[in-house]
């Protein structure tokens, strides 16, 4: 088993073997592509010390062969390490790699560097840490004597298409990048007409007939780098993109998928027995859906064998049940099969986890999906969607969180269009901070009660399962240290989990030795800052009023942060209320002082209404969110001896700096509890398939 040789922490298996790769002349069907060694590009845009002069991709569909040529100039010494190493990935189960040329052009001479014996073959498992094993091989060669100014020109072919597609070709090509490119060339030869679609001003192809084949050629020269903006939504296709497909409709993709997901054998005795146990132990349909979902999510561990056709074709439900592991398509087919056996209508469904509504603009093809989930229809006709790869989910069958994938293609014969999916989750987070201040200039006790709902509860539940309580306690302390000097946890976080309601509560308690700090630029004054850290950093705070791309927002999302401060003396504080309404979010702020108990109450609330801000609405958003960012906090201050208790301040410069520090800490926390889905997306972009 290849899994046994893998470490989950290695990108490459280190036991590379010396091997002789196959070599041949450049195929006769390939058209030589000319390029300029001095393209009209801005060299100040170059990164990593190299200039890509040519990116050439030619595909012969009848011969099932892809020819690749890369020409790169080394600009300075810093790039020699990377430019002098050539890596080519391929799947040995259905592909064959053949190198044609490796030349170094130096001072008008060409140096032949193609030495087949110098190659190493490495078993590449780039996603092993995410429990995905694709069986890819990497042919690697390190070139000797590479110098600044050299032009490295190499070409190779990969023979063989994935047989799962039954000869139906589809692919995508980008004509933009992080750095300038002298020339990009894409050429296709096909014996059948191809559908193609360009985005963002990509020019139409040059069409020709050659030896009875249809020839399609796209060429871009002096390609400028794409300008990237923060918080650009993943679904926003703002680059030059070419899609090519032989599929004539989404219905034909469904028909392909129905055959790939065909169950060709009856359920095994063991699996049938398990299903019968569920039927006997439950009384209604909802309970049965819940039992099957729990079993597939928790008892079938996430692990994918994606070698060859395995990137698209699921294992049989019997095998997945027996081996107790599978990826998204394995889990989805097993879940749908179990529900059907219980007389509940269910189907696997293909989604793209990042494209969302943009998938509607794509040409029909299965390669544009990266994930598989399940659609369930109960006896009353009500529709539910489930992601069987998510673990530690709470909620009843009717309220289980389903991610905002937006559109899905159900694998059911006769389906011709996408299901539109709306999230039922609010994903509310409620935080209550209670500060009990000692005498002025001294410390305080902080008690924090956080309540998480829906997907936020799922994430925190998984976070607490995957970390020790001691480690969590240290991370929490480190997080609050961004706000308060010398803060120590009094006790470990206390967790209360109502799984059925999907409501998870965490209580923390801290001692702050020095909550009062000197005010900047104000002698003899000390202050305490109160920041709603669960909200701070949720909204992108731009420093411009205009941009070219939409802004991505966390959606659906509802955050409430209440702060109660028990003051050591009476304070001169005025109550105030403020709200901000925008097309994409609502914000509320309220400050109340209760004089007879010397208590200050603060309320902060943000609710997202959309998953993005449009370019047209951005200017208004920028003004409002920048004004709002100066009000995400509260300050009380007095003289260092406490002789003069002064009114509050909001949004001063010092507080804003604290907020910026908090953003970094908040991002760390978000990364800790995030799901593995983004890792699956990376795998999709590299190879294709459903994970």
Task: Please provide the spans of the model-predicted regions.
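A sensor for short, sequence-defined functional sites
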Residues: 20-670
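Cytoplasmic C-terminal tails of single-pass
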Residues: 679-691
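Intrinsically disordered, low-complexity segments enriched in small/polar residues
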Residues: 14-15, 47, 686-687
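Bacterial N-terminal signal peptides that target proteins for export
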Residues: 1-6
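Cytosolic-side junction of a single-pass transmembrane alpha-helix
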Residues: 670-679
